[in-house]
Amino acid sequence: MSTLSPLAPAYLALRNEVERVVAKLAPIAVEADSSSGLHPDVLAILRESGLFRLMVPAAHGGRSETVDPVAVCVVRESLMGVCSAADSLFALQGIGSFAITIAGTPEQQAAWLPKVASGEVLSALALTEPVAGSDLRSITTTAEVEGSQVRLDGRKSFISNAGAAGFYVVLAKEGELGLSAFLVPADTPGLTVEPSVELGAPHLLGDVTLENVVLPISARIGEAGKGLEPVLSTLAVFRVSVAAAAVGLAQVALDEATRHARTRVQFGRPLLRLGPVAGLLADSWADVESTRLLTYRAAELAREDPRAHLEYSSLAKLAATEACSRVVDRCVQVSGRWGLVRDSRLERCHRQARPMRIYEGASEVIRLGIARQLAAEVN
């Protein structure tokens, strides 16, 4: 990590800890990143590392009093640089459980968060549907309250960790009240999982069908009709960590291309001494350093108050993922045919960079939100 983004000693120690985990992941990274399923060795390494504890408050087995976005960013930057499957699995453990952390009942928290911290169970956030992607208000899954119970019906699509998760946080429309969130254990009768269309994503995906799923009303997370609140808080904390993962991926691509440009001789000199190549690498370094600075500043703000500073998490995610795509593309260009060798580090970077501009807020949707915020602030 660049010295332009100074970290407190505790975060430096965490980074060193993660580097030891990364060393264990490196030998299996190519295999894990090429799989669309859950890689058991990656899960075992993460469980043993204790890193999942960063996703849960100390009261339920976590490492710190609250989930710390800066710590999550430190981990994701390092993991993504080596194994995107590990990065995804780590991030999803927090994304799927954070609604319980901040809005769950004491009983929900006690039942599930210690298992999240240990990695005994995986978590999943079930938002998207065949007709509802970025526009969550178009969700059609229904929640009908019947006395002391609630019945869920609907279909969720492209759900990360589907089929492996121990529970799902499901967003559903509760009549005229609006969207509510519910905690649905994976073994609940009426919940079934089917494989999704295979995507260029290094983690398990599936479609979740809820057919006459009956739960106690105590399965609701937070207040009725206010299910978007914990979801938005989840985005506020974890969106900035996508930026950190993008920075980590861009840094690795830059390192690979720079090593190649130093040693590859053409026209009697190393590529690095050819003006056009030098310019590509210089621009890439500027992209990496500037987005890293923005990312960690946004993470610090998210640590103070995630919802109050959501626009900065969004800015960081937009800037870093777009920059990552530019950097990786330049680095492949610098490396020529060697950057296209299947399963080489640069070719994997090329595959892994593209989805980051779509998940956890497509760039276009984020731009729209940022523009609205800007318009509201400028009189």
Model-derived features: positions:
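N-terminal glycine-rich flavin-associated loop
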Residues: 84-107, 133
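A short core secondary-structure module
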Residues: 149, 155-192
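Active-site-adjacent elements of ketosynthase-type condensing enzymes
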Residues: 131-142
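Long, acidic (Asp/Glu-rich), low-complexity accessory segments flanking structured domains
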Residues: 212-230
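Alpha-helical interface subdomain recognition
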Residues: 1-81, 106, 115, 119, ...
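Short glycine/proline-enriched turns and hinge-like loops at secondary-structure junctions
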Residues: 66-67, 135-137, 161-165
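A short, Trp-centered hydrophobic/proline-enriched beta-strand micro-motif
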Residues: 119-127
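Flexible, small-/acidic-enriched active-site or ligand-binding loops
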Residues: 187-216
